[in-house]
Amino acid sequence: MGLACAVSLSLCLIVSAILIVNARQAVQEETESAFRLAHEAVVRRLPPSHGGRDTMTEAIGLAEEIDGLRHVSARILDPEGQPLQHRAHGQLRSEASAPQWFSALMTPPLVEALVPITHYPNVLGMLRVAADPTDEIAEVWGDFSIILPVLFLAGLAMVGLAFLMTTLLTRRLQSVQAAMAQMQDGRLSVRAPDDRLTEFADLAAGVNALASHLQAEQAENDLLQARLIGSSEAERSRIALDLHDEMGPQLFALRAAVSHAQAMTADLPERPAALDETLDAIAGHALEVQRSARTAINDLRPMLLGEASLAELLAELVTGFRDVASETRVVLDVDPEVEGSSPGELAELSIYRFARESVLNAMRHGRATVVRVSLDTMPDEPGQIVVRVTDNGKGPQSGTGRPTPGFGQIGIEDRARALGATYLPPWRDNRLTHTELRMPRPCKLR
């Protein structure tokens, strides 16, 4: 916009300067031509000094006649150079209608000639003939008083047109840019608005074609991700079942055998102390292996999954955290409307792992002393289950942007996208750290 104003103003000034130079040249040529004719007439018609005629009277009449012409002036001067008469038609001449600055700008160099008036042997005076551009400058000013406003109005119109075009183009570019910004945020269903201008229509068509291609690629990736999650969960369930069915009985048998051995050795009159220590160590290790196996099985697939409600599943998780981290207070709040509903086994498993990962992050990285897990619905969207984890830990630092997500958060994001859910990474508000998972119900794989 500033460039358009500068260019328009420069063009107006250049055109004005050209018009002024040409007008000044025309005034000079017009007045010099009139001066030459007047001077030639004076030289030819002034009576000779020895002809016996009234030279001064005829010179005065000639001066009055020439002074009445346009673009020239004539006056009679005494031998000392002082005027002997006023201008013959001075009372009929109005003051210059052009402003003083314009007259000074347009007035050419003074052109004049002095013709002696003689009556032999005396010099009676001088007849002064000079170019007078006053009338011509007034005419030029009359033209300029129309041309210059029109010129500057045309310049203003050009600036207004440039501003209008710039605003129009900027708005259309901003609409395309806004659509691209939403696409960059992941909303690939947004499309750039169509336009009647061919150039912008082609630009919008190209952006929309790219968005459609990316949307198709994302849908394919989501489908593959959903299949991968389903296959992964099936494999985890199979491994958990194998561990439970094969390793569990063997560990139980091992502990039973150790207990039987301890009972048999208890009746010996003189049993070695090393034997008691060895049997106790075997019993202790067998117990730890059994606990580790139970933990691994629960990590692969929660034991209550499919047999208890989502609220009971989260309650079992919170109880486990209370047992292993007594210094942290973990609280569970469940909305009664959600307590008996089930979004599906895969969704429940995703909610369970989201809650577990978020609570662990609050304990390990945030050093939280109070963690609250809430399960409710959104007021404006009752079809969504909202799982929110809030803690009083340090959380992510404000003003540093979103931190690089870990593997746990990446897994949550992948599951949420595959299940059509919405995951909100941790953020700070009122000195608390919040994170959410919004799961539709019933939930289906995309």
Swiss-Prot record:
Gene3D superfamilies registered for this protein in UniProt: 1.20.5.1930, 6.10.340.10, Histidine kinase-like ATPase, C-terminal domain
UniProt main location, coarse: membrane
Membrane association type: Multi-pass membrane protein
Subcellular localization, as worded in the UniProt entry: Cell inner membrane
A cellular component term, taken from the record's GO annotations: plasma membrane
Residues passing through the membrane, by range: 1-21, 101-121, 144-164
GO biological process, one term: methanol metabolic process
Domain HAMP: 167-219
InterPro entries in UniProt: HAMP_dom (IPR003660), HATPase_C_sf (IPR036890), LapD_MoxY_N (IPR032244), Sensor_HK_TwoCompSys (IPR050482), Sig_transdc_His_kin_sub3_dim/P (IPR011712)
EC number: 2.7.3.-
Region spans: Disordered: 390-409
Keywords for this protein: Cell inner membrane, Cell membrane, Kinase, Membrane, Methanol utilization, Phosphoprotein, Transferase, Transmembrane, Transmembrane helix, Two-component regulatory system
Superkingdom classification of source: Bacteria
One GO MF term: phosphorelay sensor kinase activity
Chain's role: Member of the two-component regulatory system MoxY/MoxX probably involved in the regulation of the methanol dehydrogenase expression. May function as a membrane-associated protein kinase that phosphorylates MoxX in response to environmental signals.
Name recorded for this polypeptide: Methanol utilization control sensor protein MoxY
Organism: Paracoccus denitrificans
